[in-house]
Amino acid sequence: MTTTTTMAAAGADPRSAITPITCDTTGTREKALASLLEQIMDSYSVSDDEKPLADAVEAFLRSKPHLTVHRHGDTVVASTSLGRPRRVVLAGHLDTVPVIDNFPPRWLAPGDPLIREDVAAAHPGERVMWGRGATDMKASDAVFLYLAATLVDPQYDLTYVFYDHEEVAAEKNGLRKVAEAHPDWLAGDFALIGEPTDCGIEGGCNGTMRFDVVTHGVAAHSARAWMGENAIHKAADVLNRLNSYEPRTITVDGLDYREGLNATLISGGKGTNVIPDECRVHVNYRFAPDKTLPQAKTLMMGADAGAELGNGEHVATGGVFEGFGIEMKDESPSARPGMDAPMAVSLAKLVRERTGREPLAKLGWTDVARFSLLGVPAVNLGAGSPLLAHKHDEQIAESGWRPWPASWRTGSPAARERGSGARVGIRAIE
């Protein structure tokens, strides 16, 4: 592959099957990781188009005799069965958000104008992988695939989860479907989600809910406005309540979570000369993990409003939007950081030693919440900057993941580099 050239064949259908994934462990770890990243970056896997990549990941994992592999839809789960006293789950999603002129991917040589200034300053003289999914989260997926291939005798049993539909509505999420159909596949004592965190720990996550706040009026011709009631004008009170909301920062298990309540969409009206009889303000509430989902809903609409996903509009009986109609659109629980779990404490110590970084709160929602519901402590830890996720110039420097996989292997440096059969393990949870 030539630097600064695209990796996919010109004119090829990006949704077609990809070549088998391989991992050459005869060279350095860095070379193997770069090769794995190239291979999975070259697969177009926007949500709903993950199947070719899932097929290739499944075939790769089934070629490893130390792993037992299961598949549910386009989610692939591989695990060791060594009878170790504890099990760690490593999970990463295969899908990406839609491309924005950033596929096929490419390696950028030092000095290429497509390299961001902040990336060039942090990683001078390095190649940079540019393209959709580089940080969110194929760099972490590449690390997981490398570990799956090389950790043949880990200190603890391991489960690798590569799942689909993380970037879309919760009901399509592959991890959610596995948790419902095969929760035993996800059993463990600790879980790690490879969301981009610049190789630092981000604990837990804020919960999120989306709902329409609905105002009603009476339609009339705008020439005779007094014959109607303007629903859009009534929405002014909704906006006033949003403007008066003061975001709180809440400390949970030593980490600071900032909440937010914002209008993200507004719609109303059926014609330019018609007084609107309905207006909808779409609201997103991000709440700290000191609250359950029902408690968060109570703060927004009261304890007995009755608004649930799919059951239409209900009147808020209390909370911020008391008196207005509420129609739920999406909801996901928060997750406590779990930083008091023994494995989390050990991992935090290791990350601190290698990077100097202390754990932070995860302000966005991630699938750590699904593991929390299963009773499995989980944290976010992955390669790449979260600030570049979903951006048109998404990219990661070649050394952007090095602090991370190096943290997960033990044994002599020579054994680590050649990927030998020397006893290896997850040092962070010994």
Which functions belong to the PLM regions below?
Residues 57, 141-151, 175-178, 235-238, ...:
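Buried hydrophobic packing segments
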Residues 6, 11-134, 152-155, 349:
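Acidic/His- and Gly-rich active-site-bordering loop/insert found
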Residues 72-74, 92-94, 164-165, 194-197, ...:
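Fold-independent oxyanion-binding glycine-rich loops
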Residues 11-22, 49, 203-204, 210-430:
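Metal-dependent amide/peptide-bond hydrolase catalytic core
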Residues 113-127, 147-161, 184-187, 242-252, ...:
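Phosphate-handling active-site elements
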Residues 137-210, 423:
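Acidic/histidine-rich catalytic neighborhood of metal-dependent amide-processing enzymes
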Residues 88-90, 161, 192, 377-379:
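Hydrophobic/aromatic beta-strand patches that form the interior of the parallel beta-sheet core
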Residues 68-72, 173, 194, 262-266, ...:
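Short gly/ser/thr-rich secondary-structure transition/capping motifs
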